[in-house]
């Protein structure tokens, strides 16, 4: 929780709109919380022993990789994708698979991530994050019309006003080129 909370001040702009992780001002992250979170994670992993990490430890390891990357470009996406693969093994579920698909897209390219996402369509059809992730990958692949539709669906399903505004803004940006 410390690793996630450390980024809290950078998640919203002054108007209350979402700021994506890649666009957050990392200077606003709480380094003391990140350091404490890393130390607790390392101690927990030592106690568990090699190859015996549980779902919370794996989620914390993923959060630590995000929190310790100096820049968004420095994020170790292959390692994050591998950790999501392990998390899917010990705590399977469609949301874990959605996150794994995003990590794979970042590590290996949007086509690979979209293939994994599309396999989840029946399971996550009613989830805005599924449509948002799919829209982003479609846009990165140049499939603009499909991306616009997917961003629209994500906005319809969004559960908070900041998410809805963000998704509508992204849809307009993609549509405008």
Task: Report the location of each language-model feature.
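Residue-level signature for tetratricopeptide repeat
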Residues: 1, 27, 67-70, 103-104, ...
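Alpha-helical junction/boundary sensor with strong preference for TPR arrays
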Residues: 48, 84, 91, 123-124, ...
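Start-of-helix register in tetratricopeptide repeats
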Residues: 59, 95-96, 129, 166
């Amino acid at each position: 929780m410390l690793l996630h909370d450390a980024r809290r001040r950078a998640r919203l702009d002054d108007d209350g709109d979402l700021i994506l992780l890649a666009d957050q001002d990392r200077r606003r992250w709480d380094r003391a919380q990140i350091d404490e979170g890393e130390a607790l994670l390392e101690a927990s992993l030592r106690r568990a022993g090699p190859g015996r990490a549980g779902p919370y430890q794996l989620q914390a390891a993923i959060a630590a990789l995000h929190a310790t990357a100096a820049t968004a470009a420095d994020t170790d996406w292959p390692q994050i994708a591998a950790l999501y693969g392990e998390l899917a093994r010990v705590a399977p579920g469609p949301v874990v698979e959605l996150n794994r698909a995003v990590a794979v897209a970042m590590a290996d390219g949007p086509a690979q991530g979209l293939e994994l996402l599309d396999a989840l369509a029946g399971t996550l059809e009613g989830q805005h994050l599924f449509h948002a992730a799919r829209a982003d990958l479609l846009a990165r692949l140049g499939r603009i019309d499909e991306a616009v539709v997917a961003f629209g669906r994500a906005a319809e399903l969004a559960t908070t006003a900041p998410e809805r505004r963000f998704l509508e803004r992204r849809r307009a940006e993609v549509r405008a080129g």
